[in-house]
Amino acid sequence: MKKLVLLRHGESQWNRENRFTGWVDVDLSEKGREEARTAGQLLKDEGFVFDLAYTSVLKRAIRTLWTVLDEMNLMWIPVTKNWRLNERHYGALQGLNKAETAQRHGDEQVLIWRRSYDTPPPALTESDEFWPGKDPRYASLSSQELPATECLKDTVARFLPYWHETIAPQIRDGKNVIITAHGNSLRALVKYLDNISDEDIVGLNIPTGIPLVYELDDDLKPLKSYYLGDQEELKKKVEVVVKQGKA
């Protein structure tokens, strides 16, 4: 049996302000830093040890991973950062308050933008301050790779090749891996691992800062999955995510 740990970054400043974040490089809130410390201590107490770590190129995920590894005395292990693990790109919604957007467009429309599989939000323009082509960390990406907006289907399409080509072979070789990423990039992976339908994925919400453990067979098919920690706290955090897009 092989184990994989998935961790959504701790609460960010824009999570706290209930704003669409996407590829905007927002840092953790103080609560988010504490969530990361708690996650690291929990993993350490449960006896987890990692050989490799993967994360996005966004600081809220990177800082969460740093903090977790620091708590576990594992800051020395190899860490790979890749844009394919980024949050889904929220297009022209980035920076907008979710509740205010729901008041303007309706709860149902915002739910579709946030959680549907194949409906992207309105696209960003190249003149927008958040256009990723202006960011040096994406200088190596082609114009076809740079998103102006994404739905979850797009996020799956960019993440899964990296999973198959880079991460999965390490797990098959017996490496203990943690992936610290984002709500939607992790939803993309969970959809694949658990074979969740395009319709049912709408109901999947991943809370901030709580380790999700997968026990996998030799073919990397899930035997079971579970969140570590207090289950009542888990329910509260999931409910927070659910309510974010409502007016």
UniProtKB/Swiss-Prot annotation:
Annotated catalytic residues: H9, E87
Catalytic class of the enzyme: isomerase
Catalysis performed (reactions): (2R)-2-phosphoglycerate = (2R)-3-phosphoglycerate
Pathways per UniProt: Carbohydrate degradation; glycolysis; pyruvate from D-glyceraldehyde 3-phosphate: step 3/5
Stretch forming the signal peptide: none
Any Pfam family matching the protein: His_Phos_1
Protein's GO biological process: gluconeogenesis; glycolytic process
PROSITE patterns: PG_MUTASE
Coiled-coil stretches: none
E.C. designation(s): 5.4.2.11
Chain residues that bind substrate: 8-15, 21-22, 60, 87-90, 98, 114-115, 183-184
Keywords, alphabetical: Gluconeogenesis, Glycolysis, Isomerase
One MF annotation (Gene Ontology) recorded for this entry: phosphoglycerate mutase activity
SUPFAM superfamilies with a match to the protein in the record: Phosphoglycerate mutase-like
Site (Transition state stabilizer) residue list: H182
Superkingdom: Bacteria
Record-stated family: Belongs to the phosphoglycerate mutase family. BPG-dependent PGAM subfamily.
Function: Catalyzes the interconversion of 2-phosphoglycerate and 3-phosphoglycerate.
Protein name: 2,3-bisphosphoglycerate-dependent phosphoglycerate mutase
Organism the protein comes from: Chlorobaculum tepidum (strain ATCC 49652 / DSM 12025 / NBRC 103806 / TLS)
